[in-house]
Amino acid sequence: MFNDEARLKLLEGVNTLADAVQVTLGPKGRNVIIKETHLTKDGVSVAKAVKLDDPIANIGAQFIKNASSKTCDDAGDGTTTATILTRAIIQEGMKYLATGVDPYTIKKEIDSDVKIVTEYINSIKQEIDLNKIKQIATISANNDESIGDLLANAYEKIGKDGIITMEENKGSDTYIRVVEGI
């Protein structure tokens, strides 16, 4: 399988995974059932559950999984947004490849656009307060206000430069433990 046929198969995988994940976007995102037993609105969980039979399409899906996993690792959220943006970048890149633009030029343009978007985001960013942190955390926790309260309390205790690490608890209690640094 070469060129156009392979690109179409890759794009098929990208689209299949992105279609499954994009419905979870934002506070009004919909739930997705995974294997009859798991109901989730978490984009990264949906992405991890997608397995495609076609190996080339599966590589395309893996592009999306890698982007969403990296976003989750770096930011702790935003996996659905990363999925949607990655798909859009891949789709546009494929269009340019089909018209004969070389991959290096496409990459240079993407890098240039990333710089422009980053500068714009930095120009409109806003400081947030504990109430906003609570709102964001609540939304990220599928509207669980107790988690929103907990994270807002954690930020209040550690300050804006502190680091929060979450660990799974074997018990049923959810709690904060502050560990002083050096």
Predicted region positions:
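N-terminal glycine-/lysine-enriched basic segments
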Residues: 1-180
